[in-house]
């Protein structure tokens, strides 16, 4: 086999998504999902795409999806910088929490970032935001 990096070709974007965004690949809507590219989960975008509030280095991520025990729940939130390096992560136990809400204090990074919300049934959802 061939070792190396994966090349992801660019795809059609909403007017709000910059061409150099990590969301600007054909992977959006197939490997991971966004509000603009929900792929096969088009009816699920409203409850699965992470909602992000960012103010002065404080980031709050909410996934408006109910936690239904281990049957259907949000597994985790992960924050990435513009280079897709992890800058924060929260795992959820659906038997302990009723809502997928995570908070992060990010002091050493500013710029474009991504919030991932992973559902145990409906895959990974990504939202771009600015810290």
What are these regions (language model features)?
Residues 110-120:
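Short, surface-exposed ligand- or partner-binding patches at beta-edge/loop junctions that are enriched
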Residues 41-42, 55-92, 96:
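Contiguous segments within soluble domain cores/interaction surfaces
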Residues 60-64, 99-108:
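Exposed aromatic-hydrophobic patches
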Residues 1-16:
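N-terminal export signals
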Residues 14-58, 91:
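Transition segment at domain starts
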Residues 118-128:
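Short acidic/polar inter-strand loop motif in beta-rich domains
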Residues 90-92, 104, 127-131:
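Generic detection of short hydrophobic beta-strand segments and adjacent strand-loop junctions
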